[in-house]
């Protein structure tokens, strides 16, 4: 490593260019920056896809926290995770195993001589989410998660016996979830110990891994598809493990209820929930989803979040602090705060908590006393962008990693009493693909909506000139309880759309998160009501107040609930205001909602089951005959085969109707994608077709010689007409 030089963050800078789909997809993607104990450097990973080689490469680097310069730590793409053991010592996961196909290895090395490390453990399957704690004797206790058989044995896909039949048989739901079919294997947290050797002898695995989850029937942690290392924690002394699992006694498809379990690291006892129905400290009436368990520095307390409602995935998260061994009711902390935080860390002295929460179109950091009363209002100390990870430095400041609408990676320091202290690195100052992007690319406004003021982002194109006019792109977010935030996305990136020659307006209508729970909750049984009214009022505001926006040649696009709303708009007066529409994975036929996997979602959104409240389901039906008769705007329909949340039949049904009605339309399908399109090659086609579609009908294709065209896609179009 000594041959590598520290590189200036501006070393790769080049001339500003519009953000093309190719640049968006191939721009380096960096992980959170994890500081070493001294606070001098931080380690992070980078991956980058190439359309020349059609491969992704990855490497690890060190970031100098004083100068902002970086240098490569290792180019070994098999290094999947890194944990600091000391200022120079590192424990890392090698994603391959020389002795066990499908297994992984743990290696110990020095940051100053990375290639000279040694193997400390050979693990029998694929594991990730490594967390460690050093004991007084110098041993390293660790936890990680992998797949498990019902008997607790780690599941290794490469060594598993392939069944002779492809049949699947189910006696209960779930049958499938997100993009996979459920089987008898499940996620589980495993514990192990690396024993410190004597003298010059290094660490080695002491005994076998222990499954901490499988002894609890029907438990699973982390919970797929989005669960990960934040679903469990290891106490600083290595004695205890806390993990989240959905309620084993309840039907998983009908309830969001989950508990936080506590178990000794050595698995000497079976895990027990601290907030289950029979737990002595369970707060009265609190039955919703639990999340993000985090031990205090001395290990005697455990912070976590929990929702109240047992069927509402977007209920407000409330912070709780449990005292280990206590049978008293677990107290809430700042329980009346009208925000829904989703990450938490203790300050080193154990007196204060730092939480991350959506707030007014950002993800901000807040501080609050660990014993704050319910009426306490946490104090924000970051502003723009979306903070995604944060670690304490020796001087009690925080090293924060985040993003913004104008950069996919932003590292800075902040402190509760001082706010943002120092910017260390930002991708738009490093990467040629993002060069020229900056805060001036965006603005925001509020307008009077259906019942309250509504927020909207404005994203400008390259070389924006307010004396000119640019066609409108109307972005509608999914969820429906979600938002457009000041954060980077490689799937729906408004800057990449704007740089075709548009102004993007991205409103946060009724149902949006981060603006108070009342706005979020108001979309229940109201999908085509207040949110649609908000969008109409937003369009009117833009038409009347933003002189640089050409609403006569505008287009609209949305995914998931945003796709539903595009389908709803197609049959509404607002649909006639647009030259083209793009609907990605949206619901179309009201009665088809019963085909989803997370039944709690639809049953909560529409106030009952499909058979008890069918009128509610049909109230906002884009496929109602009277609405279909209004369809007229050219429409691109995108739907993929592995989308089990909103099955592909929804998109096919919509396309059938559009074709039968003679509306210009196209169907884009990916057999290997789910609710999202993430494969780089597929993502490129997705962008070419979505942007090409709107460019064709808005007139941008003719006015901008560099605009994306439908003809850019090399995949042949099937057209029997």
UniProtKB/Swiss-Prot annotation:
Report if keyword Repressor is assigned. Answer: no
- Indicate where this protein resides in the cell: Secreted
Q: Which is a GO BP term held by this UniProt record?
A: proteolysis
Give the top-rank taxon of the lineage listed in the UniProt record for this protein: Eukaryota
* Region named Disordered: 271-297
Please describe what this protein does. Answer: May be involved in metabolism of dipeptides or may affect host defense mechanisms. Has a substrate specificity limited to the hydrolysis of X-Ala, His-Ser, and Ser-Tyr dipeptides at a neutral pH optimum.
Q: What is this protein identified as?
A: Dipeptidyl-peptidase 5
Give the species this sequence originates from: Aspergillus fumigatus (strain ATCC MYA-4609 / CBS 101355 / FGSC A1100 / Af293)
């Amino acid at each position: 490593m000594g041959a590598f030089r520290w590189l200036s963050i501006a070393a790769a800078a080049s001339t500003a260019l519009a953000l093309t789909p190719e640049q968006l997809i191939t721009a380096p993607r960096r992980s959170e920056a994890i500081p070493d104990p001294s606070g001098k450097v931080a380690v992070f990973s980078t991956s980058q896809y190439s359309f020349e080689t059609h491969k992704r490469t990855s490497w690890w680097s060190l970031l100098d926290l004083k100068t902002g310069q970086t240098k490569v730590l290792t180019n070994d793409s098999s290094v999947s995770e890194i944990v600091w053991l000391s200022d120079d010592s590192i424990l890392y996961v090698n994603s391959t195993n020389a002795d066990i196909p499908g297994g992984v290895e743990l290696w110990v090395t020095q940051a100053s001589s990375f290639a000279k490390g040694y193997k400390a453990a050979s693990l029998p399957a694929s594991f990730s989410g490594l967390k460690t704690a050093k004991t007084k004797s110098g041993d390293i206790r660790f936890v990680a998660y992998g797949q498990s058989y019902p008997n607790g044995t780690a599941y290794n896909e490469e060594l598993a016996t392939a069944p002779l039949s492809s049949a699947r048989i189910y006696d209960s739901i779930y049958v499938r979830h997100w993009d996979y079919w459920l089987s008898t294997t499940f996620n589980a947290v495993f514990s192990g110990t690396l024993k410190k050797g004597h003298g010059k002898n290094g660490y080695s695995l002491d005994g076998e891994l222990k499954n901490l989850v499988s002894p609890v029937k029907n438990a699973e942690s982390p919970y797929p598809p989005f669960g990960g290392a934040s679903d469990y924690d290891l106490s600083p002394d290595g004695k205890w493990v806390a993990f989240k699992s959905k309620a084993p006694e309840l039907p998983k498809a009908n309830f969001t209820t989950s508990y936080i379990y506590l178990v000794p690291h050595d698995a000497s006892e079976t895990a027990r929930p601290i907030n289950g129905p029979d737990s002595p400290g369970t707060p009265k009436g609190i039955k919703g989803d639990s999340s993000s368990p985090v031990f205090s520095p001395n290990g005697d307390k455990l912070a976590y979040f929990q929702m109240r409602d047992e069927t509402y995935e977007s209920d407000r998260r409330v912070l709780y602090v449990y005292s280990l061994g206590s049978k008293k009711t677990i107290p809430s902390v700042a329980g009346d705060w009208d925000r829904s935080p989703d990450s938490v860390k203790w300050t080193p002295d154990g007196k204060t908590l730092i939480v991350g929460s959506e707030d007014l179109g950002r993800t901000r950091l807040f501080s609050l006393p660990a014993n704050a009363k319910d009426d306490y209002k946490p104090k924000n100390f970051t502003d723009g962008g979306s903070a995604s990870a944060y670690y304490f430095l020796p001087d009690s400041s925080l090293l924060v990693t985040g993003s913004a609408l104008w950069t996919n990676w932003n590292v800075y320091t902040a402190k509760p009493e001082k706010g943002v202290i120092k910017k260390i690195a930002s991708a738009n100052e490093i990467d040629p693909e993002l060069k020229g992007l900056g805060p001036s690319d965006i603005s925001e406004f509020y307008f009077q909506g259906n019942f309250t003021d509504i927020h909207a982002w404005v994203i400008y194109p390259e070389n924006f000139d307010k004396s000119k006019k640019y066609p409108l792109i109307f972005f509608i977010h999914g969820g429906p309880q979600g938002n457009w935030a000041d954060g980077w996305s490689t799937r729906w990136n408004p800057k990449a759309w704007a740089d075709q020659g548009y102004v993007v307006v991205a409103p946060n209508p009724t149902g949006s998160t981060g603006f108070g729970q009342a706005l979020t909750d108001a979309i229940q049984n109201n999908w085509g009501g207040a949110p649609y009214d908000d969008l109409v009022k937003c369009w009117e505001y833009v038409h009347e107040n933003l002189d640089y926006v050409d609403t006569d040649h505008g287009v609209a696009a949305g995914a998931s609930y945003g796709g539903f709303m595009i389908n709803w708009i197609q049959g509404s007066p607002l649909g006639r205001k647009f030259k083209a529409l793009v609907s990605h994975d949206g619901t179309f036929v009201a009665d088809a909602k019963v085909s989803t996997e997370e039944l709690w979602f639809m049953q909560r959104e529409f106030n009952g089951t499909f058979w008890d409240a069918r009128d509610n389901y049909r109230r906002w039906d884009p496929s109602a005959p009277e609405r279909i008769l209004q369809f007229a705007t050219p429409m691109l329909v995108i739907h993929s085969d592995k989308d089990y949340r909103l099955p592909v039949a929804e998109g096919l049904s919509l396309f059938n109707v559009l074709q039968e009605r003679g509306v210009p339309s196209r169907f884009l399908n990916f057999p290997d994608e789910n609710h999202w399109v993430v494969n780089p090659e597929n993502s490129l086609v997705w962008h070419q077709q979505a942007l090409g579609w709107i460019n064709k009908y808005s007139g941008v294709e003719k006015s901008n010689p560099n605009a994306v065209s439908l003809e850019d896609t090399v995949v042949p179009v099937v057209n029997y007409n």
